[in-house]
């Protein structure tokens, strides 16, 4: 290692020699930096899972613009929207078609009497073009009463439960004291607000949510004509719809706003962000403590170098050399351990906790 550093630096690797002079102290310093790296990796991993699960449901929607209640921050919260807003929107130039979107939470009761929560989406069967190709291909079958498409990756549910369903056989289960029959599947998995996802027709949705009305969906989905800018149409809609009761966004804008709300305003996102900050501070404190102690221990040697005519940048180079060595040697075990913890956490929680391509660079630099 000394020879390699000597070639890279073009001089004797004084910083490396000083750090490794006491192997016990060096190992403790590396362990501290590795822990700080691990802490940041884990917080970023969980934040990444939150971002992924927040945006994933939007992949099942195929729309350009969404009209929501003024107080809605996510797909699942906020007041309902009067269906009349859909009819108003259809009169605006550039709007080609529209559909209501109903959203709710149902509890899936398993044979062992445990429950899993299902984030439930619904629209009219005739409006399946507003859904992704995967869902739309199966959605026409939901004209049958009390039928659904169920998430086979629902958290807390053994995959064997859906074995018959994957073979083309219907799967009946209990929801809110009623029987619902799954006749198709989708794959998403659990998130922070629900254990899985369910798609039903609007009529089935209204049967299971007795207090909901067909005249008050959660959102209104719109498609614009070919060659027309969704942003331009959204501005036209904002000019005629009451801002006090509804908000109009392109689907991309609403996704970005939803993610920002989850990350910056909800307690979960704030806690994870604070954890990243703490990890960075811990790393800075550990490295500073190691470097300051090492400098203090070698003041006599530095004084000798100074008397020999070495400039200030020489000493700065030694300190930066030590900082770089600690960063590299602490990063490697932190990265390896975090990969193992990611896999374990993902297996236990069914959250999409994984290492993306940019995260190692974010943490290291």
Question: PLM ranges: what are they?
Answer:
Residues 25, 355, 359-363:
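Residue-level signature of transmembrane alpha-helical entry/exit and packing/kink sites
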Residues 29-39, 269-289, 323-330, 334, ...:
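Alpha-helical transmembrane segments of integral membrane proteins
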Residues 1-40, 51, 56, 320:
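N-terminal Sec/SRP start-transfer signal
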Residues 292, 300-346, 350, 361-362:
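Transmembrane alpha-helical interface segments in multi-pass membrane proteins
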Residues 34, 38-118, 138-144, 235-239, ...:
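Hydrophobic, regular-secondary-structure patches
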Residues 130-133, 150-249:
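Basic-flanked hydrophobic alpha-helices used for secretion and membrane insertion
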Residues 54, 236-285, 293-298, 304-305, ...:
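Peri-transmembrane interface segments
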